[in-house]
Amino acid sequence: MDRQLKSVLGFDARTQKSAFVLAGLTAALLLTVSMPSGAIASPDPSTPPPPTSITLTGVVRDFKERTVQNGHPDFEITPAHGYAHYCGALSADLGSDGKPMFIGQGFKVKSGYEWRNSAGKNICWRLYDPARGDLIGKKDGTYIDNGGITNAASFGTWFHDAPGTNLSCALSLVLNRSADGSYVFDSTIDPQCVANGGFFPIEGQLFGNPGGSPNRNFHFTYELHTEFTYDAAGAQMFLFRGDDDVWVYVNGRMVIDLGGVHSAVEQRVELNRLGLTNGEVYTLDFFFAERHRTQSNFRIQTNLLLHTASVPSVTSAFD
């Protein structure tokens, strides 16, 4: 194509460059028109939304109360200093088998004087830190009382299979995501628990209901072994409210101590207290016991994305 023909057709380098610029401006204008003011881009589809629930599977062990043949001495017992919240009966660290260890240095917490954080929420006495503005609790006297745990041998069967003493099976809990983003299992709203009048997950199973009034299976323990990823910016927490005994360990260290036979009591742990490393995976081990009539309450609330790490062997299938 000679220069004269290019000139006639308007096809020179300057015209070509102008056409490209105009096309780019047109595209940008169309994009601007299609995105309303204040609109934001869609989230990355490769990032999945948080799950609507998490399922945790652990082991429940059934016991017979102390007044019957082959009954366990720690179940349906009244502690020497009465029904109350007791601490200190167990070691600060899990044993080599991943289970809590009895040390027999328990004390009764004075009513109304729990250890609390600066917001007034109950925390484990072992995590008390005055530099954070925590409020110190009080012991009810100087005596030792382990909250109705007879000795190390009796406690040794709480979270271990013991032929003739307990029967065990797997048990799963579903924690549903709430509006604030935390995951909750609450026996006061769970349909099956409401129908049963409380947290009685093995009604008519294993040793069965013992009779009496109310005729519920009150005498059992439950353990969970889970993992999570620590997020230093996530304000991560774990809370339990219920009865009777509950102990929680993170990275093998006790962070909740709710020993004793008592009505519903609450403690929480804020994970930024624990010196964890951002992005690392840690264990959370949970141990619960229901030891006495007439109530059984159980509430877990957490914003941790927990998942089951392991399920110990059991003596019975769960249907």
Stretches with model-predicted labels:
Residues 9-12, 25, 37:
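N-terminal regions of proteins, emphasizing targeting and processing segments when present
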Residues 1-18:
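N-terminal secretory signal peptides that target proteins for export/translocation
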Residues 40-319:
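Acidic/polar, compositionally biased interaction segments
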Residues 5, 16, 32-35, 40:
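Intrinsically disordered, low-complexity segments
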